[in-house]
Amino acid sequence: MREPLVFLSAVLGLGIAAQWLAWRLRLPSILLLLAFGFLVGWLCGDDPSLAGKTITDEILTTDLLFPIVALAVSVIMFEGGLTLRFRDLEDSGSVLLRLVTLGALVTWGLAGLAAYLFVGVDYRTATLIGAILIVTGPTVITPLLRHVRPHRRIGSVIKWEGIVIDPIGAVLAVLVFDAMVVGKSDEVVWVLLKILLVGIGLGLGVAFALVQLMRRYWIPDFLHNSVFLAAAVGAFALSNQIAHEAGLVTVTILGIALANQKTIPVNHVVEFKENLRVLLISCLFIVLAARIQFTDIVELGWGGLAFVAALILVVRPLAALVSTWRSELTWNERCFLAFLAPRGIVAAAVSSVFALEISSHYGDLAELKNADQIVSLTFLVIVGTVTFYGLAAAPLARFLGLAVKNHQGVLFAGGSPWVLPLAKAIYEEDIPVLVVDTNFRHVSEARMLGLPSSCASVVSDYMEETDLGGIGRLLAVTPNDDLNTLAAMEYAPLFGRGEVYQLPFREIVAGRRETSAHNRGRYLFGQDATHSKLSFRVAMGAQVKKTKITKEFTYEDFLKLYGDTTVLMGVLADNKQLSLATANTELQPKPGQTVIALVDPRDGEAN
């Protein structure tokens, strides 16, 4: 794999393959990305003709790789900032503040001490390692949160911490490097002020400029994503030129400022950046993991493993405990927070930059004889923490009652009389449901049936603040076909296109009167199962029934009993897995499964 084109194509293909396999196997994508990265590194192993270097090093030289990594990280941090809303922290803002200040100090001190005791590095290198390992980062936190999907409050705290702590850790590492390695301790305060002034000032300034350009419609729609991306990358590069490592502060502030202003919409930009983030994370993890040689990690020995264990079992729990002391978080939330702090790309990038700087300019200092271990130790921490948290986060969240194993709950957009019996039938099977309707009478009836409900529009800003823990699909079942279509479009990025459903239009007509397939959800139940027809059936006495299918009473027997007018709505498997009937999917209920259907009353049954 000596050809750069072949190598880069393989990295891209393996990255997307890892993401897809992780989705299919319901595993954290980071685990597979690391595995594929090590596989690439093994395939591109040492070549005698390269004087100890790997083929990966030959294709992506240090001078080329680190700027690419830095720019990719800047885009990821910018996208992360765009997802941060101040309203998410209305009841937990103090916890975040303590996590990124007091918690960061505890992590810095204890991680540095652990590196000194277990790995045997000198105190300067240990202090620098402690500063680098403060960061967690959206490159690992975001995929894990998407995999676990914990309750909204603790999820928001973890997401905010993962993004805000990155520039803090990078800045602290710069200060430590200048003070303890370069020997410019008298300039630390000035360096810090310079980074903050440049980072915050430039971030807010670029955000203001973008808002003004967008507000005046000086940027055409087709250039929105490109302009935002160029602005973020340009601001990052300019900040770093003025003050070293101020770029991460700039892009984070830029993203947060744009996300919380009320003048222009940025949702379409966020969607583009999310797609770009998946691509960048996939490629970065594989490329950086491919550069690591197992011999470097093995040389750390048991001391390296003890260091990783100390970070997971001692350092993070103590930092979380101190930061959440007497806070509004429950003990279960604190416990989950204490066992989720994986390190990612930012830690790898920062450690690589400082190791290169030390080896290039300060390698003759005896006090820094262990500096070459910074990168290998950081990657050991990345592998160890990602593996541990990747495997343990989801089971722990479910054990603590902060997440569910299978996000197959249903969000009902609409609470008409025929909808509520269906919602109740699903809710009785311990599957989460939420009924949302602007008609208070429908909401009141849902509450009388014991169903979680909310009087709101399903496409309102209010829904962005609603905890959708356990919810994994949308049923848009209002009388308004256009609203159903809008809801399907709104929730497709959240649940996936395969999990957004809506009722068929009142008249299915090919051509200009039908909404395009890519702009709507999957049609529920059947092509003629419109809202008016279902409502009429219920008004005439039809009922939603659950019936167990057995070998003695097959689905064919069920259809014979209730007739051809039966509308199959869904099937519950033995493991409580719910499959919904659609116009293009023919369900075949088997013995042991439960049928949910709208049936007409038989003779002698009450309406």
Task: Outline where the language-model segments fall.
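Cytosolic regulatory regions of ion transport systems
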Residues: 329-330, 354-376, 380-607
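Transmembrane helical cores of multi-pass secondary ion antiporters/exchangers
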Residues: 1-405
